[in-house]
Amino acid sequence: MKDNTCTKRDFLNGTKIGGDEPFFLISGPCVMENRDLLDRVCAEMIEVCGELKIPYIFKSSFDKANRSSVNSYRGPGLAEGIKNLEYIKNKYNVPVLTDIHETSQISPLKDVIDVYQIPAFLCRQTDLISQSAQTGKWVNVKKGQFLAPADTRHIAVKMNESGNNKLLVTERGTSFGYGNLIFDGRAIPIIHGFDIPLVFDATHSAQLPGAAGNSTGGQREFIPSILRSAVSFGIEGIFMEVHPDPPNALSDATTQYPLSQIKSLLKEMIGLDRYIKKEILISRSSL
């Protein structure tokens, strides 16, 4: 276990993560509903992150392959998703991330995205991890709700044996009986013990899986409190899905965070992050 951040290292676009470096942000709408939504969210997030000096990665999904109901909206599909990601990347000059579900999706995305994301339910899929790693790009693996924090070391080994150590692990809550998740903060120092950069997913950690019958429910009101707790452990990145009108979003309507409120929440996290890394963790490591 390591009660500190991970070792400092180079990241995207000349930025660094780890040590006392400030957090970066992965954020965007849960799913690609339409081009106008992607434009609006990315433009506003770039403005917010530029003002707050937060390194920003745009995120959105072309296919939500694990929806609870077969009738739920999944997204535009891979071909249209690639066009959308190319459009956002070229227009805003921003790194982009999307999730993949099959190894066949890796190659078509290679020249477009900067970070591959492995969904939580697929976090043990060796071929998906290894072949993503072989591209040489960063790979963000969502830690499954069922996975012990110590078992993330196996993910790191799969990455390293593929010749790539550009791994991020995202903590997104742990199953707590049926239809509920909790955030177990012990996961952060445990994962840091393997020197893996840790991202905290504040929006999915507030989910109530299957609680809405045909879809996943959630408790958006707890997101700020959960995020404060995670930041106080010292983390490298924050993951948050945002939407201008969450109740009418086509996916994760109960947990996407209101776009209009993201700036004030991030400002609060900047102060807490700076205090923890400069005054607590780094000073403690020198004792």
Swiss-Prot record:
The keyword Zinc-finger appears for this protein: no
HAMAP family: KDO8P_synth
Location within or outside the cell: Cytoplasm
UniProt gene name: kdsA
Family affiliation: Belongs to the KdsA family.
Protein name, as recorded: 2-dehydro-3-deoxyphosphooctonate aldolase
Any GO CC annotation of this UniProt entry: cytosol
Enzyme Commission no: 2.5.1.55
One Pfam family, short name: DAHP_synth_1
GO molecular function ontology, one term from the record: 3-deoxy-8-phosphooctulonate synthase activity
Gene Ontology biological process terms from the UniProt entry: keto-3-deoxy-D-manno-octulosonic acid biosynthetic process; monosaccharide biosynthetic process
Group of enzyme by EC: transferase
Entry keyword annotation includes Transferase: yes
Organism: Leptospira interrogans serogroup Icterohaemorrhagiae serovar Lai (strain 56601)
Domain of life: Bacteria
